[in-house]
């Protein structure tokens, strides 16, 4: 008997015991029957078989799936019920026995037939078995963290812990009162408490204006953190913990073939950002990049591009530079870009030194230098030392997609919003969904209507309105604010609201090394090059390339070398062999904007409040894909020089853009016929409505956009205050 046959036969015997044990020890399932549970345990142990370590069935896959069929997987109940019955029918028809009692070879035969002929059911079991085995133990699978022990990664506590604040001069956000009732007329109502809106609220409140800050989500604290590999903003397989909830918050996603999908926030097509105080800055990876000077004048640098609305920004890098600096110091950024010869000029260094290198950094940095490239430390909105009253990063692997359990990751929720509230001039209302911007018979805004935390429709009057809901939701709000004078929505006289939806097409390469690259020192990403952001022959722009954040085990399931089996003993052995020896180099390809990549209002689908939802459609420009393919080659070159013995590309894909780096839908420009807001972030035809978020970006650079959104927040606030003091926006 050869080794493979021995393993499979031994696995069958162990799996049979697992299935029998499953049936004997669990008599009260939430959804499954005892017979279904026995069948499912045997099938899960085919997908992740037992060897020296338990298989998926032994490690609690049935408990995991049964629990989720009453929760997040409710819509899959019928598929499971039919599929498990079909599994038993095939087993009885072919072999005259129950599936759990078959030999390894016969069970594999049934499993392969299900994969071929019942793919919807089989793929569910495949995905859910992998999630249970490689995900967080708190959901019933991965019992005793068996997969993490198999891969050689630590098994930390599942729950977060309280934050011990370092004494400082900032206000703890968790002591701030949060109101929900309407108030008298105020100077400004700001819709959205994220990267842009939080800054605007703070700047206006500190200038003495009365401000109401409306946020649809909640104010999460470090004590709300959960180290959950399956339920976070990046890997939302069991939901997005910082909102919005799946129930009642759909969007319509149109594929390039015209097929329409109703997408939920936990699904990739949704382009979700966190809906909470702090917005995406609560759970971001915290890369805090300045755009380069050329990123603001792409049309002047490269000329027109057929099929693209490529244009220059109406403002320059020099206009934003002091506001970049202000964001870096008030939010808090660590890093050192002294070794980056391509950086835009700065007047002041970053306030904190970089984090110390991890293993990937130590391998990739000298390789980049050997290639004549210029590696340097990524700027991070993360404390490397105690700063602004909070302690330093503890270097865990749960970073991007997670809130920081020690509050060392900096966002508007723990920096500027507490300062806004401390003035006494700003009132924060959470759980409040804005329905529309209200306007008078002259077409000027008078305030907003919104649903409060109890679902009651309220009105908040204001001298002016600031929209900061992120690019997709900001466009949706403007389009839903239609009146007699604004029949197509506020700012949409020339049909530009919602167009030019951009994000970033992430591309790069994966490398396998013959030594460990993984050392469990977070956040993972730490080293970057900007050699290919511009100056690539025949290309308009490029991308920053960097090592990736730590890949959790669940991320590696579908990231193994091409040709690896999707399941079975071969997949499990590949996970064990390659997980710690894999490194990823990737970057955000600068996208070429297109008018047909857009946000519209769906005519049929509405959310839980009865508001028409966003409809996303379009495609990526062919030149964007060309840039992405070129970046794959550059990343591959870097990995090979670093010693990778095998590499493969992460090529760009077609389809609607957006994602967490969404931008462009309320484009800034001097011409009202081709833009939505002017250079002051002011709607062209409504002088007391402003948009201050990534929606105003004309182009989105080859970098993570959050620091630019923050800089625009400070810049836009300064422009608003100039107009407030000078011309009287008071109504």
What do these predicted ranges mean?
Residues 377-381, 392-399, 436-438, 580-591, ...:
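A glycine-rich dinucleotide-binding beta-alpha-beta segment and adjacent secondary-structure elements
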Residues 237-238, 244-252, 263-268, 290-295, ...:
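Conserved redox-cofactor binding core of oxidoreductases
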Residues 1-14:
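N-terminal secretory signal peptides and thylakoid transit peptides that target proteins
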Residues 182-194:
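Beta1/beta-strand and adjacent pyrophosphate-binding region of the FAD-binding site
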Residues 203-206, 210, 217-231, 423, ...:
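Glycine-rich loop(s) and the adjacent beta-strand/alpha-helix scaffold that form part
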Residues 37-38, 42, 57-176:
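Mature-region segments of soluble proteins
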Residues 220-285, 323:
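N-terminal FAD cofactor-binding segment of flavoenzymes
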Residues 257-280, 284, 290, 295, ...:
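FAD cofactor-binding and catalytic pocket of flavoenzymes
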């Amino acid at each position: 008997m050869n080794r493979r046959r021995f393993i499979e036969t031994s696995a069958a015997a162990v799996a049979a015991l697992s299935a029998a044990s499953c049936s004997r020890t669990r008599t009260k399932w939430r959804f499954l029957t005892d017979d279904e549970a026995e069948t499912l345990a045997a099938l899960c142990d085919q997908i992740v078989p037992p060897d020296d370590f338990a298989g998926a069935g032994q490690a609690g896959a049935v408990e995991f799936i049964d629990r989720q069929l009453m929760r997040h997987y409710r819509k899959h109940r019928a598929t499971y019920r039919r599929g498990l019955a079909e599994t038993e029918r095939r087993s009885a028809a072919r072999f005259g026995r129950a599936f759990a009692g078959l030999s390894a070879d016969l069970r594999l035969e049934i499993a392969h037939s299900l994969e071929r002929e019942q793919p919807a059911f089989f793929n569910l079991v495949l995905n859910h078995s992998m999630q249970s085995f490689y995900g967080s133990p708190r959901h019933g699978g991965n019992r005793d963290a068996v997969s993490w022990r198999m891969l050689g990664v630590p098994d930390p506590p599942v729950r977060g812990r309280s934050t011990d604040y370092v004494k400082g001069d900032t206000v703890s956000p968790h002591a701030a009162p949060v109101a929900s009732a309407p108030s008298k007329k105020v100077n400004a109502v700001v819709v959205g408490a994220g990267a842009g809106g939080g800054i605007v609220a703070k700047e206006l409140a500190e200038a003495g204006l009365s401000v109401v800050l409306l946020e649809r989500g909640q104010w999460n604290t470090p004590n709300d953190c959960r180290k959950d590999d399956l339920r976070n903003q990046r890997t939302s397989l069991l939901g997005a913990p910082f909102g919005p909830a799946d129930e009642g918050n759909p969007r319509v996603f149109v594929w390039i073939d015209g097929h329409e999908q109703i997408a939920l926030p936990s699904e990739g097509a949704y382009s979700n950002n966190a809906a909470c105080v702090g917005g995406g800055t609560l759970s971001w990876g915290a890369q805090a990049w300045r755009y380069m000077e050329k990123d603001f004048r792409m049309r002047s640098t490269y000329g027109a591009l057929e099929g693209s609305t490529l244009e220059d920004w109406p403002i320059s890098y020099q206009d934003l530079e002091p506001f970049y600096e202000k964001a870096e110091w008030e939010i808090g950024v660590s890093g050192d870009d002294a070794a980056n010869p391509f950086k835009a000029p700065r007047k002041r260094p970053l306030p904190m030194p970089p984090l110390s290198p991890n293993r990937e950094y130590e391998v990739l940095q000298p390789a980049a230098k050997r290639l004549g490239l210029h590696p340097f430390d990524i700027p991070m909105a993360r404390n490397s030392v105690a700063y602004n009253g909070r302690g330093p990063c503890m270097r865990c692997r749960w970073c991007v997609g997670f809130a920081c359990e020690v509050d060392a990751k900096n966002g508007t929720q723990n920096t500027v919003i507490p300062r806004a509230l401390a003035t006494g001039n700003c009132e924060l209302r959470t759980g409040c969904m804005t329905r529309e911007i209200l306007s008078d018979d002259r077409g000027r805004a008078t305030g907003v209507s919104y649903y409060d935390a109890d679902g009651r429709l309220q009105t908040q009057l204001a001298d002016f309105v600031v929209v900061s809901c992120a690019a997709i939701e900001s466009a949706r709000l403007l389009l839903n604010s239609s009146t007699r004078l604004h029949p197509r929505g506020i700012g949409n006289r020339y049909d530009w609201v919602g167009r030019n939806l951009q994000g970033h097409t992430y591309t790069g390469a994966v490398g396998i090394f013959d030594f460990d690259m993984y050392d469990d020192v977070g956040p993972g990403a730490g080293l970057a090059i900007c050699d290919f952001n511009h100056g690539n022959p025949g290309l308009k722009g490029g991308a920053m390339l960097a090592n990736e954040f730590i890949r959790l085990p669940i991320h590696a399931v579908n990231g193994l070398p091409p040709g690896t089996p999707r399941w079975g003993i071969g997949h499990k052995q590949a996970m064990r062999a390659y997980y710690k020896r894999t490194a990823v180099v990737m970057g955000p390809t600068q996208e070429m904007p297109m008018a047909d990549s857009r946000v519209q209002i769906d005519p049929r689908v509405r959310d839980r409040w009865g508001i028409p939802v966003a409809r996303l459609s379009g495609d990526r420009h062919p030149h964007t894909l060309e840039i992405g393919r070129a970046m794959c080659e550059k990343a591959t070159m870097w990995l090979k020089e670093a010693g990778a013995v095998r590499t493969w590309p992460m090529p760009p894909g077609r389809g609607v853009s957006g994602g967490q780096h969404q931008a462009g839908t309320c484009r800034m420009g001097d011409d009202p016929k081709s833009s939505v807001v002017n250079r002051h972030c002011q709607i062209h035809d409504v002088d007391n409505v402003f948009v201050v978020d990534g929606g105003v970006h004309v182009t989105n650079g080859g970098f993570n956009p959050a620091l630019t959104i923050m800089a625009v927040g400070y810049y836009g606030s300064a422009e608003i205050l100039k107009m407030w003091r000078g011309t009287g926006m008071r109504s």
